[in-house]
Structure formats: C-alpha cells, structure tokens
Amino acid sequence: MDRYFIVSKVGEGGFGSVYKAMDRQNADRLVAIKEVRLLGLPQQAMIEASDAFEREVAVLSQLDHPNLPRFYEHFQTPTSWYLVMDFIPGETLEEYQSKAPDGRLLLSEVLDIGLQLCPILEYLHAQNPPIIFRDLKPGNIMRTPTGQLDLIDFGIARYFKPGQAKDTVALGSLGYAAPEQYGKAQTTPRADIYSLGAVLHQLLTTRDPSDAPFDFPPLRPKSSHTPNDPGSLTTSIVDVLMDKLETLIASMLTMDVAKRPPDIAYVKQELQIISQLWSDIYRGYWRPQRGMSR
C-alpha cells in the first residue's frame, strides 16, 4: 500500500470499502482501490467475498472499453484483498436521479441514458464467451460531470457457459435481476436486457422495482399527454411514440426469456428510432404532464 496515497473513502459495502487514491509510481494518477476485508468474516461470508473478488478481477482484467474502469493490479495483505482500477469522478445514476425534481428525469435524457448503456452491454456480450453483467441498476452506473455513463462493480458478472443448465450461484439485485437469476436457469445476455428495461422503467416512472419485483405498471395512462400548442401536434402522434417506447420496455421486462428482444443491438436500434422521432417531431414545443417530460 506504500505505492498509494489514500485521498478519501468514496464508498462502503458489506465486505469492504472503496477509496480514492493517488498512484505515486504513476505521476499521482487517480485510482480507485476496492478493499475486501476478510478478517472477522464468517466462513460463508468469506467464501462469498472471495468469489466476488476473484470474479471481478477475472472479468475486469480482460476488458478494454472507455465506459468501463481500467484494471491496474490486485494484491493482498494478511487481512484484506485489494483491487486497483480507474477512478471515475461523478455520482451514481441513483444519486443523480434523486436530485431531479420529483425524481423525474427528462424523457430525452432517459433515452440518452439507454443509448449510452447499450453499447457497453453490447461490448460485454460480444466477448468470447459473452460476459453477462447481472447487476445493472442505477447504483452501479456512474455519471461523470460531462454526462458520460460508466458501469462499475463487476462482483457478480459471469461468463456465459454453453450447455450449463443454470448459474452456479444465484445472484442479483432484487427488482432489477431477471427471474432466471434466481436459480431457475442459466443467465444469458437477455438477463441484462431485462435489467436495462427495469432501469429505464424506473427512470421514467420513479418507481423503485425492488418495492414489487416483476410488477411493472404501464408508463402512463392512455392519452394522458396534451401538447402545449394543440395546433403543433396531435395527441395521436404523441401516443404512437409513447406506445412504441412502452412496447419496447414491456418486451424487455417479459418473464419469458425467449420473448425478450434477441440482443442488445435490437434494443439500441429501437431506442435510436424513438429518440430520433422525439427530436425531429417535438423540438421542445411539447411538454407532457406528470410522469413524462422532455
């Protein structure tokens, strides 16, 4: 640890903490150091912490993407394990949403969030074998001061294993995790599609999916939107766009894996169409009622 100067603690979890530090051997480069404390843990907790640490090291050390933290090294002391990676400035998407009026983000912003996350998941799923993140939620998405989104916390990410009936360990965050993550089947990239659907639904409705897992009410009542200038738009056009978004998110959240979108590229394409339509038609002239805003 002499190589690193600890600046501050930036996070804490069940098994340890995350620190912002300077790497003295690399021009005081800012890094994040994830500490897993093993001292005093019960045997089962020690096994879980060790497994999560080893998974994160195995996955991060193989990845190179501008929206993922770069892995530098890992080491251990008699009482703790440490993982050193890029320090990502900013706040989590969960923190960012909590500061919005009524917790509601602009629809254009939610679409941008989805379009930023899709290429990251696409990159993970394109690995050989595919990497399934398995824990996509606002608390694991960092938003930098420039608005860039990065995924953090690969503690339960796993490689897809062809022919395996189900995951070795059932893990995930309640409400965001796909039903197959609860031990009923092996997770595939479509599990991340489900989680992305849960995130988008929460950003659009402010409804926390952990309050009632697998229950996702409609985004808005039918014909609940009225243009500011009735002459500029018709309610039917608004409904067409919102129905398209509703249909996409509902398909992402279906319990049946086979009925979800085939891959994240399809989701990205649909979001691009909706986002472009929104931009081309509305140009800021229309402001929906509570629940959806531009």
Predicted segment positions?
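Conserved activation segment of eukaryotic-like protein kinases, specifically the C-terminal portion
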Residues: 167-180
